[in-house]
Curated annotation (Swiss-Prot):
Compositionally skewed regions (Pro residues) per UniProt: 677-690
Cellular component per GO, a single term: nucleus
Keyword Glycosyltransferase among UniProt keywords: no
Predominant location category: nucleus
Role played: May be involved in BMP2-induced transcription.
Tissue-specific expression: Widely expressed, with highest levels in naive B-cells.
Record's keyword terms, sorted: Disease variant, DNA-binding, Metal-binding, Nucleus, Repeat, Transcription, Transcription regulation, Zinc, Zinc-finger
Start and end residues of each BTB domain: 10-133
Annotated disease: Immunodeficiency-centromeric instability-facial anomalies syndrome 2: A rare disorder characterized by a variable immunodeficiency resulting in recurrent infections, facial anomalies, and branching of chromosomes 1, 9, and 16. Other variable symptoms include growth retardation, failure to thrive, and psychomotor retardation. Laboratory studies show limited hypomethylation of DNA in a small fraction of the genome in some, but not all, patients.
Polar residues: compositionally biased ranges: 131-142
Record-given protein name: Zinc finger and BTB domain-containing protein 24
Amino acid sequence: MAETSPEPSGQLVVHSDAHSDTVLASFEDQRKKGFLCDITLIVENVHFRAHKALLAASSEYFSMMFAEEGEIGQSIYMLEGMVADTFGILLEFIYTGYLHASEKSTEQILATAQFLKVYDLVKAYTDFQNNHSSPKPTTLNTAGAPVVVISNKKNDPPKRKRGRPKKVNTLQEEKSELAAEEEIQLRVNNSVQNRQNFVVKGDSGVLNEQIAAKEKEESEPTCEPSREEEMPVEKDENYDPKTEDGQASQSRYSKRRIWRSVKLKDYKLVGDQEDHGSAKRICGRRKRPGGPEARCKDCGKVFKYNHFLAIHQRSHTGERPFKCNECGKGFAQKHSLQVHTRMHTGERPYTCTVCSKALTTKHSLLEHMSLHSGQKSFTCDQCGKYFSQNRQLKSHYRVHTGHSLPECKDCHRKFMDVSQLKKHLRTHTGEKPFTCEICGKSFTAKSSLQTHIRIHRGEKPYSCGICGKSFSDSSAKRRHCILHTGKKPFSCPECNLQFARLDNLKAHLKIHSKEKHASDASSISGSSNTEEVRNILQLQPYQLSTSGEQEIQLLVTDSVHNINFMPGPSQGISIVTAESSQNMTADQAANLTLLTQQPEQLQNLILSAQQEQTEHIQSLNMIESQMGPSQTEPVHVITLSKETLEHLHAHQEQTEELHLATSTSDPAQHLQLTQEPGPPPPTHHVPQPTPLGQEQS
């Protein structure tokens, strides 16, 4: 209802009582439709869309957190340690001003409101308790479960000038008003009622506020064995008696979350008792009397409850009561066994909302999502450096401790942890411990085996949301989805050809690698062609048989000292020259390449016959001369006649030295070979050679 009041200056001031309710109702409608929601809060893998502005206006915790981030804020936040149903009820209050909850869950909701500093809810609950002083609060019976309905009083001054719904005096009026405003009543799940531990993880440590459901549990803080097994040690390992009032102890690493929250040391879970009152005192419960500390006798670590101490002591005794039925591996906690079992089943219950990647643990999901947000949530307490993943922080911490990263002894590659090194070592040893029982194929990693088994079963659980194509491996699906985006981020450095996937680029680079090797080989041969002709050897580019009257002519330079000839049983010889390189076969080209790759001064030319094809020379192993291309020297022609070849074949076991008789009238002379006994050449060039020595006149 609008009210108008005259002002002395003649101006009118119009006030609408319904405006604040209308704005809240509009926000709630937008939240349900997902319209203009600029933030996603994830609690126990449940996603809550919301508006940053309204959260900051309703919660001092969110307000300080957003203010600390400034302009680099993000859109996805993971709230650790909270209950999804409890947070949903609290978010409903922020958007409507009404709280609909069961009587047993109000304590946990109030503790969450205290931590998030939603003081309007705390004050509304205080007023509700004062106005309903009877032991049994007024309830609205829905499906047999008592439900407490709390709203802000109309006559209370709002903190931020926000209007609140009028206080309803009767249940019938309240019920009709809720129906008129189309409010949705959230029923609390039984699991919420059974939860007795509220854990909030922050950057500075772990803050635990235990809210008991019964007075006898307050006086005797014990836990049932079944609950003991399900509670991981990490929730209370860092407890310190000094943190009883809400001060978080300093831990070595910042805790697992996507966003870096406001330091918990500036907050108290139960709030300022002078201004806002204690949550437990409001609820009319007795405070748990202080008992003896649960301290570990081995390391002196302190725990809040004895069952946490019992779990911790297994780290000293080595007790692992939880055994895997598949491989027999033991674990100290039931939670660790459940995570391990997923390795056998392939279950990955945690899915990234950005890229749909599935992961086995919540911790893995938190670290993965930090890569999308770009937020570096893990802080080194020594130097203050930030990291996006916990393993990066652990690796960095070795700088302060002096410990080095695990290193492979074979290739000296370093790894983040020992488990990664262990997997890498299998690439050197060839070990493949994971074998498929169906086809016998082995793998180095268990994940590869699990993916392979899906092929036998025909399972393709990963489907593309665009074209519907299914895949047996999540990584294959991710690579496929990149094709739909049209992006090609991978570019070839050689030809600038772009690819959408990295594996396609690697396959493409192999083509350039082969071309480069072939180009290097041809450039080596081509660059030394002139030197080969001038300084080493030239034979006529044809094959001739010794059955005719033809002769073999060899052009050699003065730098040639010896020619070691090892004939085969065949009567024919074929050889390659530099001038005939364009007609070479692949084998001949390779042989000619060998001719140009020896570094020392020319001493021997070895012509060795091929065993399978004795008509052709298999290789020319010749050492280059050091003479430069600009130098000139006489070229001599050596003629090997039919008789000479026959003589070499007949006496290949004997050592002979052939002298050359020349004249100096022509730089290229035909030389006649004469035979004289001589010493054998060095035997390290060719086994059992028959040398032909050449002396220059």
